[in-house]
Amino acid sequence: MITQMQNLTDAEHAILNQTWRGKKILSYLQAYGFDYEFCRSFRLTEGEKTGWMLLFNATLMICAEKPVALEETKTFVEMHLPFRIECPASFLPTLVTLPNYQKLRRTMFVLTPQPVSEEFQPEAVQKQPDLTAVYQILHEGFPNLLSYPLWLTDTSHRCRHGISQVLTYRDSTTVTILFDIENHVLVGQVATCAAARGSGYARDFLHWLANQLQQQGKYAVLYALDIRVSFYQEIGFEAADTEWVLERLDIEKEDVTKGALQ
C-alpha cells in the first residue's frame, strides 16, 4: 500500500537517518515539510515491512530496508513518470522493466583531505555567490539541469533555511553542500565553466573544501556518474560505494548521456 504522509514518527526519522538516501529525504522534509505539491512524501507498507518515498519535482527517492510494495511502486512510477529514480538495489529488478528508462551507475566518493597547490587563493572563495552566475556555470556542465526558475527557487529556499550552502571559486568553479545532517555532508553540483576547464581550479577547490570539512569533524561524500569518475580518482578521493539510478530516455535534452545533475 502507498499512502501520502502527513507526518514522520521519531522511529521513522531514526531509520531514514541511517542511510545517505534517507538523509537526503530528511533534508527535503526539513526544507519543505508535507504541504507542498511539488514535494510529496509517501509511506510504503506491505505486511510488517515499511518504506518511504519522496517525489520532488521530477526526482523520486525511495528508501527501504527490504523490498516493499514493489508492484504498487511500479504503478506509481508509471503514473508520475519521474525523470530520475533513486532507489535501493532490491527495487531495480522490478523498476528496470519500465519502458524508456536507462540504468546509470554512480560512484560515491569520500572527500579525502589533500594538500592544495601554492596557486590556490582562499580569498577567492565566495560563500554567498550570485546564484544566477552559479546557474550559468552549472548549465554548461549539466545540460539536464532543472529550469532556472525551479533551480533558483529550490536552491535559494534551502540556503535561506540553512540546509544547503553554495560556494564558488574564482567565479569559475562551483560546489554545493546539499545538506549537513549530524556531521554527515552530501556535496553535489560540482562544475567549472568551459573557459576555466583545465585550470586546476576544481581540483584545488575540492581539496580545500575536503580539508575544511575534516577540520570541522565532518564526513563528506559526493556522487559521480561514470563519465566523471576518473576525475575524482585522479584528485585522490576514495571510492566508497557504487549504486544504480534510473533516468528517462524519452526526454529531449542537449546531451542525455551526461545524466541529470547530481
Where do the PLM segments sit?
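A mid-sequence, solvent-exposed acidic-amphipathic segment
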Residues: 132-186, 191
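Terminal substrate-recognition subdomain of acyl/acetyltransferases
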Residues: 112-116, 227, 234-262
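Conserved donor-binding loop and adjoining core beta-sheet/short helix segment
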Residues: 18-82, 171-189, 193-194
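Conserved active-site tyrosine of GNAT-family acetyltransferases
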Residues: 95-98, 231-233, 237
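Short amphipathic alpha-helix that is part of the acyltransferase structural core
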Residues: 1-27, 106-150, 256-262
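Conserved acetyl-CoA-binding loop-helix of GNAT-fold acetyltransferases
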Residues: 68-76, 189-192, 198-215, 234
